């Protein structure tokens, strides 16, 4: 235990466990020991919600049994989910949105404003009015709670992070050319 003092605890609250969300939880489960040993990150999933039910466990949800625990959980309630995350008040809390819900996307400001980081594959918040995106990024800076959305762009390729690193190293982006539709990109590359 003494040697684990440098391990950083991340507390995840996951909304949306369909195809993407369930794969995400499987990946967390599979990589948990690697992350702890090599990156000094201990990841605990504290809350999980789908559109019907939600479940919380202060000690961390057993990821080998999350589906049955969720099935036996309480009725899903987005405001109550947020209130529970807020009430638990864990350091290094991260809200993970694996939905395509506009209603969920509108809650990001509340999470970030309570110093809860947001990681999302939901495109809605970043594809709405630019002012909304700016507000979320400003809140993230003000409350030191990252707002991360890398999977929104380029079919999950690390485009945004790559651009940030290029700019940080002094490069100037003069022009970006892209096919912004995954479907059209497929057609152009195959026909």
PLM-predicted stretches and their roles:
Residues 49-54, 153-155, 179-185:
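Glycine-rich beta-alpha junction loops
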Residues 4-113:
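N-terminal glycine-/serine-/threonine-rich beta1-alpha1-beta2 phosphate-ribose binding loop
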Residues 94-97, 118-121, 147-151, 175-178:
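General beta-strand structural signal in soluble alpha/beta enzymes
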Residues 114-118, 182:
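Glycine-enriched alpha-helix->loop->beta-strand junction motifs that scaffold or abut catalytic
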Residues 162-191:
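Conserved anion/nucleotide-ligand pocket segment
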Residues 41, 91, 143-147, 171:
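A short helix-to-beta-strand connector/capping loop
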Residues 23-27, 56-63, 130-133, 158-164, ...:
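Short acidic, glycine/serine/threonine-rich loops at helix termini
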Residues 101-113, 123-166:
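Rossmann-fold NAD(P)-binding glycine/threonine-rich loop
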